[in-house]
Design a protein with these regions (language model features):
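Glycine/small-residue-rich interface belts in oligomeric ring/scaffold proteins
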Residues: 1-32
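Internal, well-folded beta-alpha domain core
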Residues: 31-196
């Protein structure tokens, strides 16, 4: 199997490390990532995520995100609503929509066709993966960024339905939904990136 993650993140007071929370900003971020392994120049085997696409709901995040990272952020419309125990997140411009039940429940069944035997096994693929990678084709360099997270507790949720037009552009053969988790209140920062 190969695994692709669609991460939807509501940030709070996002700012460069060392800056006061007062100047932080709240953004909604969407990341499309593929699970990878990379052997660095020292011979160390690193597990992480390779960036396929990144989106945000604010131009400010696109501007500064593309200065400080190689995540290639684009701004899109993002709509969120909660009604009758169901969260809906969608974008007309980006062509995605998903609906999940708000209740976190260990007894939620895995999605049909999931390659995992149970949620315990599925959690091993819910991170946190320490590294994020981007590749610069022109310079043939890999940027490696290590993220540091605390309180990472993935809780299973039931995904009612979903559609992401971007995933269709990847032309994957018979993709299946492997799992769906929600993770809340994560203190998070990135270490300075390294280029190889």
């Amino acid at each position: 199997w190969a695994f692709i993650a669609v991460a939807m993140v509501q940030t709070k007071a996002l700012r460069p490390k060392g800056f006061p929370e007062l100047i932080g900003n709240n953004f909604f971020l969407i990341g499309y990532r593929v699970f990878v392994r990379y052997t660095n120049q020292a011979g160390r085997n690193l597990r992480g995520l390779y960036i396929l696409k990144s989106e945000t709901d604010k131009k400010k995040m696109e501007f500064f995100g593309n200065i400080f990272t190689h995540y290639n952020y684009a701004t899109t419309d993002i709509h969120q609503s909660t009604k009758d125990g169901i969260i809906e997140i969608s974008s007309v411009k980006s062509g995605f929509k998903l609906r999940v039940e708000t209740e976190e429940d260990e007894n939620v069944p895995l999605p049909p066709g999931s390659p995992f035997a149970d949620w315990k096994e599925a959690r091993r693929f819910a991170g946190p993966l320490p590294f994020t990678f981007t590749y610069n084709k022109e310079t043939k360099e890999v940027l490696i960024i290590e993220g540091v997270r605390q309180d990472w507790t993935p809780n299973p949720i039931k995904l009612i339905d979903y559609n992401f037009d971007f995933l269709s552009t990847l032309k994957l053969e018979n993709p299946v939904l492997a799992n769906a988790f929600i993770i809340k209140n994560i203190p998070y920062y990135w270490k300075k990136g390294k280029i190889e």
